[in-house]
């Protein structure tokens, strides 16, 4: 009786708000019969994969065409009436109904941004009604693993107005016993890096994800700076802190050629270059080392480096189980990046994580470059025991909000909390 009455969805409200880049995005609020409610705000990416679910934008002159009032109206006029009377506890039924109403392969009718906002808000409302944390609602009693953070402290590519082709150069602070110490380590290196950049007369302006965006001559120069910053902060590269890359190779790939740092490279040459980087730096993870549809190249990359480092498919898989299955069959990677707005519902996100886990792939829960104060991904990383999270650098409050949420979760868990880095989990070979 409690489920049939107290957890019934009463109504869904929505509004247009702004993300961290000043672009409109959707916030949804699900209200239950019992009086509980839950809110969620969806993020948006800058370097988006061609196979991602479709964001609904208004077009026209307002907000340079990026308004989302149409998506908000879809929630008010279509989604809310359809969900009224459903149990918020039946997340699968809620998400399935929205997918059925949309009726398109990529959610282009209702919009992935409107569907996702409602999907996440539904889970939040259920957790609030049960008076339990979201990570506990989405997970189980064993959901006590705090993730290793992959901290994007040097931004390039589509995330920054500088000369770097690779999009992210990340710190992976793993050689400590808990998340809070990992965060402290990353923060101290971040400030050490800022000091180094100042000393060298390089810009300390930050990019979309809070990392520095200096004009550097090469990825190697970025790697050298990170190693110097780690040592300057008093830590040991490779032993306590490793490195990770997001090449975002699709952004500089065309007609079978990678236009990288003024050179034209084929897939084999790009793989050889990545292999040299792995040999010369303590790199434990490479994301989107090749382009999203270079399947043959990905298989070769996995043969070359798959037993040495984590090879993460972001644009390659777009949190989509169909593309992930293809990658598993073709042995195209060994890890998947999880971005909830790439697929558009919580249910499909959890399905992708489960498929990855069953297939021996790791999962990295990730933010987007256009973020908000919403902290759902922090809870999701603990709920699913993914062991890894990407949520930006150590500046910009929309990034820090997720780190602060993880600190609170670790505090709530007390002596039950475990840290993936201390257990040798997270990226390969840490």
Curated annotation (Swiss-Prot):
Residues forming the catalytic site: 209 (proton donor), 339 (proton acceptor)
PANTHER family, alphabetized: ENOLASE
Listed pathway(s): Carbohydrate degradation; glycolysis; pyruvate from D-glyceraldehyde 3-phosphate: step 4/5
Keywords from the UniProt entry: Cytoplasm, Glycolysis, Lyase, Magnesium, Metal-binding, Secreted
InterPro entries assigned to the protein according to its UniProt record, in alphabetical order: Enolase, Enolase-like_C_sf, Enolase-like_N, Enolase_C, Enolase_CS, Enolase_N
UniProt protein name: Enolase
Amino-acid positions noted as binding Mg(2+) in the UniProt annotation, renumbered to this chain: 246, 287, 314
Species the sequence originates in: Prochlorococcus marinus (strain MIT 9301)
Entry-linked CDD domains: enolase
Catalytic activity: (2R)-2-phosphoglycerate = phosphoenolpyruvate + H2O
Gene Ontology annotations for the cellular component aspect, listed alphabetically: cell surface; extracellular region; phosphopyruvate hydratase complex
GO biological process, one term: glycolytic process
Gene3D superfamilies linked to this entry: Enolase-like C-terminal domain, Enolase-like, N-terminal domain
GO molecular function: magnesium ion binding; phosphopyruvate hydratase activity
Cofactors: Mg(2+)
SS bond partners: none
Pfam families for the chain: Enolase_C, Enolase_N
Coiled coil: none
Enzyme Commission identifier(s): 4.2.1.11
Binding site for (2R)-2-phosphoglycerate: 167, 339, 368-369, 390
Family, similarity comment: Belongs to the enolase family.
